[in-house]
Amino acid sequence: IIYYISNMLQKKILFSQSSVSLEIIGLPDHSNDEKRDQISIISQWKLMIIDKPLIEGDVNHLSSIIDAFLTYSNFIINEDNSFYESKLIDIKKENFYTHSILLKSSKENVKPLNIKIGNSVLSDILNCFDQFKASDKVRNIRSNVIFKIPRKNKFKLKNKDKITSIILPPLI
């Protein structure tokens, strides 16, 4: 009976984008007088990608997965490194269109899961994570990602005489 009651109290919030859905399951924190429709204590999450196995775990796994995807996408944007590696997940760029994700289980005797996704699915996953992070219905988990914003090529003025001859018309 206890399992049934606690299961009834749990809330589920779904974040979706085209081929990907992120489901957050948990409870509101009544000690902080939070609303009943909020989730502050995340007990489980599920990442569902069309035609791929279900990916799920606890809140620590979710934080690591989000950090991995955000860091990897930042690498791609900055054209730095197209490989991310951690003890839980590896993501690497196979080619211009395909990314390989290796998920390592925290449980013993469970083989790693290798998934290949395209750019559109990667974008959908990132969109779901962005929806989750922006939501006021779910407690925001801590992220360790520091974004490196690419610097635009700046026009450097080294020789003032050269620039003057380019801008001004020739004087006769």
Where are these regions (language model features)?
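Cytosolic/nucleoplasmic/matrix-facing N-terminal domains/tails
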Residues: 1-153
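C-terminal single-pass membrane-anchor helix
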Residues: 152-172
